[in-house]
Amino acid sequence: MNFEFVADTDARLIRPIVHRDERGCFARTWRAETFSQAGVAFVPKQGNSSLSTLRGTVRGMHFQRPPHSDAKIVRCSRGRIHDVIVDLRPESPTRGRIYAQELTAVSGVMLYIPGGFAHGFQTLVDDTLVEYLMGEFHVADLYDGFRYDDPALPIVWPEPVRAISDRDRGWPDIAPRTPWLADSAPAGAL
């Protein structure tokens, strides 16, 4: 696996080494020693998957508040997604920055997202499957989010939004809950 920093954050793009032959292909997606050697202190505690049947589906923006901020590894195992992260850590030099990356089943590229980031994605094709390894267990009382179209964080979604849950549509704005956001660096993209 090859690890690349995402712009100026401690998030990482992870490019598995893919072995191909007449049967198809094989790639290792997790090995504790490899992650540790790359400086990624991550131990999976939970695995999740989501299947979105419609192109243009948005899921997000989600995060889990301290003390159980959840690092995660995201992989698109079928289809393509526009994956978005926002650094919400108040002391981070990249707080408030938006980063986006296309993840596809064909490339196998994964995204490591440290705790303290919000995460969301939009499907770019029908029948898209996304899998996550989570560094924390889900804690319902600490689960939080903000709207995908929050005016304080101008996230660009490449497709018209065709499907979104009532919960994701109903999240409150982020700015009243993060007073430091107004002083943050301008939004950036990968």
Where are these regions (language model features)?
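Conserved metal-binding segment of the jelly-roll/cupin
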Residues: 103-126
